[in-house]
Amino acid sequence: NTLYLNFLRHYLTKIHPKETAYRVKKTTKSAHTRLCPVKKSIKSHPHRSTFRTHCRSQFSTVQSPNPAMSSQINVKIAQDFLAFNQASASEFHCTAEAVSLLKSAGFEQLCEKNKWDIKPNGKYYVVRDQASIIAFAVGGQYTPESPMIGTFAHVDSPCLKLKPISKQSSADMLQVGIQTYGGLLTHTWFDRDLSVAGRVFVNRGGKITSELLCIKDPILRIPNLAIHLDRTVSTDGFKPNTETSTVPILASALADLGFEQLGKTDDADVFKYPADGAKAASSCGKAACGASPAEKLAATFSVKHHSAFLQRIAFELKCEAKEIVDFELNIYDTQPPALNGLYKEFIVGRGLDNQLMSFICTRSMIDAVQSGLESQKSLMLVGLFNHEEIGSMSTTGADGNFLASVLGRINPTALPQSSARSLWVSADMAHALHPNYTAKHEVNHRPMMQKGLVVKVNANQRYASCLSSNAPLMLCAAEHDIPLQDFVVRNDVGCGSTIGAMMSAKTGIKTVDVGVPQWSMHSVRETAGVLDVQSSHKLLTQLYKQYADYEEQFDCSL
């Protein structure tokens, strides 16, 4: 207590020199200590909010009493990710959060439609269709023949997406039709507080703009069937039909009739259905004579979805329902991410696969170029792609031409020479050993939580890792005493894949597949380790800084 209160006194004196009469005082009747101000208490101190913020940053470590966890768990990088994850309710929001990080670090936006003027010491990023981003920094000593070092991840996660015609109803309940996206663990989406997030096309005075939408309130739910009505579910397993059993409930059917009492509240920030809700929303289904093409689109669109739902979207975007032209929306879990475990050593949240690697890759490059860029020889890149969970074959996916297009514009003269000296790091989450299912892992390749980044290897090239691509990463880890783990799948289990193999084949650049180990992959809520986030961020940051030196140490020619 005395040590802590001395810190308070030192801090308060520092931020407010005139208020120097804070002192540690021991009471006469007990051994307790307290901070005794002469003029003002801490509660009334003018810098109270600053004080709280400072304390959070100063005490953002959790000292583990467990001897097995001898080092301090610095949760700062994990807390930064929690904020990133909370704001990334869809792939579009995740891309926008990456843009925010890059802008804050001084990166300049480029547009594919325009000419580029790339200069040494420059930091740039380019976004494609709001769902994929490539950022790069040009070293001050860079030449067209210099090596490239890049880390790549994906922003999408398995989820439920709204159908083009979502309007459904059953048993006097309004429902929204959904499609399953990727290989999600369907049963984990039941009995969750769900909402929608994505992007909406809005007609703003004749110009159609794409606007991000995230309804933070839980407005959807997929209820489980009571065990009394399905007695064999515990013995035969829960096998939901993804077409009929996973249809979320939006509201009672009364809402679509403009029932005046629904949504009524004294809170000005909470959505209220208008008294003429049905008329207000349905009126946009009739295009007036002489309507513009956008207005006609909106009129056609409005009949495909519940009017009450469109009213809620309009409320969030501060527009009218008749101005909504189209949307692309995911269903997401509204429960915030959190630190979990006795020592706050676990991160739990939605979409860790692969928002966590997207965050680590982006932060690692940003931190690597904050100083010393002028002496760098390398071209450093980070790429976040869409549609990995469904094969990556799209304009915003890693199997598209986005990366090749960017590389060609950066280096139109000597790309083959540079590629031969370069390294890609494909970063996608890995499977941590589950204590309840240890037999699922190969006996000698069991990545553990809190034991470091995982290098994935597959003899059939489902992963791109090979001897020449692994070596620089392993050398960097050894130099900085950063742990690495190895993973191969059991021979009697099918092996997954990610973007590494396709990127390596398309660009001819050696690639290593890595990932932070996690539990519950493709669940609505996943788990990873704080220490793995720390060590992975440190490793990739150092690899960015030192790859040009490592590259010169290897000769793979015959």
Predicted regions and their residues:
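Short intrinsically disordered, low-complexity coil segments enriched in acidic
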Residues: N1-Y4, A414-L415
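Short hydrophobic alpha-helical segments enriched in small aliphatic residues
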Residues: T2, P17, A31-T33
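Aromatic (phenylalanine/tyrosine) cluster motif
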Residues: Y4-F7, Y11, Y22, F51, ...
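Polybasic, lysine-rich low-complexity intrinsically disordered segments
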Residues: N6, I15, K26-S30, K40
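Acidic, Ala/Val/Gly-enriched low-complexity intrinsically disordered segments
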Residues: E19-V24, A31, V38, V62, ...
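N-terminal hydrophobic/helix-forming segments and targeting peptides
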Residues: R34, H45-L558
